[in-house]
Curated annotation (Swiss-Prot):
Gene Ontology cellular-component terms listed: urease complex
Keywords: Cytoplasm, Hydrolase
Coiled-coil spans in chain: none
EC number: 3.5.1.5
Top-rank taxon: Bacteria
Known catalytic reactions: urea + 2 H2O + H(+) = hydrogencarbonate + 2 NH4(+)
Any Pfam family the entry gives: Urease_beta
Family the entry assigns: Belongs to the urease beta subunit family.
Protein name: Urease subunit beta
GO biological process, one term: urea catabolic process
Organism expressing this protein natively: Dechloromonas aromatica (strain RCB)
Enzyme class, broadest EC rank: hydrolase
Pathway info: Nitrogen metabolism; urea degradation; CO(2) and NH(3) from urea (urease route): step 1/1
Amino acid sequence: MIPGELLAEPGELELNAGRPTITLVVANTGDRPIQVGSHYHFYETNAGLSFDREAARGFRLDIAAGTAVRFEPGQTRTVQLVALAGDRKVYGFRGLVQGAL
């Protein structure tokens, strides 16, 4: 084994298995691209994104860790969100929650 080497088992991994998910239609109403990372609390994303924010409270994008989704100006796309795990406490981001969900 080489230091830092990862040995993966054969087969496929299912991301976020068994966690609640929702699907939302999101539109970028601004004039600049908006990029949202994999672990960003979707409820607190840029105000230029138009979608059902209350439905997104406690959810993040259902994509691989370290990746992101980019919304071009005027673009509308459908995204899948997955429930945040762990203690379900949210701090930082845009400061809209600052505590337990």
